[in-house]
Amino acid sequence: MTEGARDFRGKGRAFRGVLGGESYRRLAALFGFQERFYRRAVGDLQLGPGGRALDLGCGPGGLSYALAEKSPADASIVGADISDDQLECARRGAGAFACGMEFLRASMDELPFPDGHFDLVMTSMALHETPPAVRRAAITETARLLKPGGTFLLVDWSRPRFGLWGIIWYPFCRWGERNRDNWNNVYPELCRERGLNLKEDDYINSISRRQVFVKEG
């Protein structure tokens, strides 16, 4: 089945597919997901010469852009998303960076790349939009796609800390089967089971947790 024909229903989509592309980007910015957020998410991670990165659920490209800002010209970044609107928005800004950038329509649990293809796999505020089974399959794919010693950057909401955003988001985060993984922070365990070991764990703001894992080997 080709990418264009693949049925992504049930895979999950930001804002349940109501908003996408530029509308999504503007609304997300109102909630603090701007350049500064994505730069903090990337932190000191970077690609070396010829390095390759994959952005799962890339949306309009904010996390990919933050990494591209500090990447050499011969590095490459691939963003994957199931929303054509998001991908179109991401592609519009890709030409501003020296490194290679590609944005393709693909689901994070079924990716068209060989084993050990990437030095870095990353995702920001995307896993919680997918069903639990898709999340687990996406982490399995991440472990498959990373080179030994490669890095997995996972940024998503977690149990809120004290602070304004924590107070605002608490009622939305606390209940529901879809939210349970994030509330209970099951990702370190899921990653460890797949050979990805936790190296960094902190918060970007009151609800956005940043975790860095390294693949064994």
Task: For the regions a language model picked out, list residue spans one by one.
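N-terminal, positively charged/glycine-rich alpha-helical extensions of SAM-dependent methyltransferases
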Residues: 1-22
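C-terminal alpha-helical "lid/dimerization" subdomain adjacent to the S-adenosyl-L-methionine
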Residues: 7, 31, 153-194, 198-210
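Conserved SAM-binding loop and adjacent beta-strand
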Residues: 23-40
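Short glycine-dipeptide loop
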Residues: 50, 73, 146-151
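Class I SAM-dependent methyltransferase SAM/SAH-binding core
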Residues: 54, 59-110
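A short acidic, Gly/Pro-enriched loop at the edge of an enzyme's catalytic core
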Residues: 109-120
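A short SAM/SAH-binding and catalytic strip from SAM-dependent methyltransferases
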Residues: 120-133
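A short glycine-rich, Lys/Arg-flanked "PGG" loop and its adjoining helix->strand segment in the class I
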Residues: 136-148
